[in-house]
Amino acid sequence: VTQIGICFSYPAENTPELDAKVLGMTKEVQLTGWEDHLVGADLAEELERRGCTKLPITVINDTPATYLSGSTTIANNYANGFAGRVNGTGTNTCCLLPVRTIEKLGRDADGEMLVNLESGSFTDVPQSAFDKALDATSAAPGAYRFEKMTSGRYLGELSRLALIAAANDGLFAPETADKLCALDTLSAADADAFGADPDCGAIAALGDAADADRKTAAMVIQGVFGRAAKAIVANIAAIVFLTDGAKNRYRPMVVAVDGSLFRYSTLLRPAVSEELEAFLVQKHQRY
């Protein structure tokens, strides 16, 4: 080993030394004492304390890392545009932008720069009652609203809140409704599994419910994941239109995606593909 690379998936400020100064925590992670710490320098110090040889450390956000790893596998003459995306515990996107369009740089120069968009922090998005309830009880109310609608850390809780609302609206038999209203937690993995197969037993509260109730619950969950897919496609479409790419059917724009939610969810990936086809390909002829 001659050097170490770290993917860091929290807000940070890059330094000239290729390190990253932590700016904050997201995705309900709550730590103290992180302010102004350098990820690479702290790791190097700890490794040296444990007797390891000192090695150069480079820290990069996980989304640009996904972009770079994906772009190395695609021939330049194949893709007409490229973007990186992470859909896991959190959500984010990145893309190449002309340097002169990046206002914070204030440079009238040629060339492009890979920009970490931190799209999960987008807040100008319509919220449902479920979104507002989740946001109010989160570690950072009012922040990262887009992430709270589209990422694995929150889709389970959104599904739980939607199921309780459906129970209160009389969509289930009384006994099933009571059990759902008593449901304290629901993970995105269990919600996804149940939404894909109502007979899988992933939600214990619905284990002995009637078939009709289980199917109704699955439809509610599918709606939550389906809305997330629409939001994700809107995010991708924004990059397509911003970069004015994806106009050639035979040289499509490529989006490199990583993250546990996109990789393992049964519901999300096909829903995203369906929405991409309907919105970008069929409606806007972008490929």
Predicted regions and their residues:
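Glycine-rich beta-alpha junction loops
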Residues: 9-11, 87-91, 121, 261
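Intrinsically disordered, low-complexity segments enriched in polar/charged residues with Gly/Pro
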Residues: 80-82, 140-141
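ATP-binding/phosphotransfer module of carbohydrate and carboxylate kinases, centering on a glycine-rich
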Residues: 1-5, 45-48, 72-73, 121, ...
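Short glycine-aspartate micro-motif
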Residues: 3-7, 56-58, 82-86, 92, ...
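Glycine-rich phosphate-binding loop and adjoining helix at the ATP-binding site
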Residues: 12-75, 81-83, 99-126, 269-274
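Short beta-strand-to-turn element immediately C-terminal to the catalytic PLP-Schiff-base lysine
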Residues: 94-98
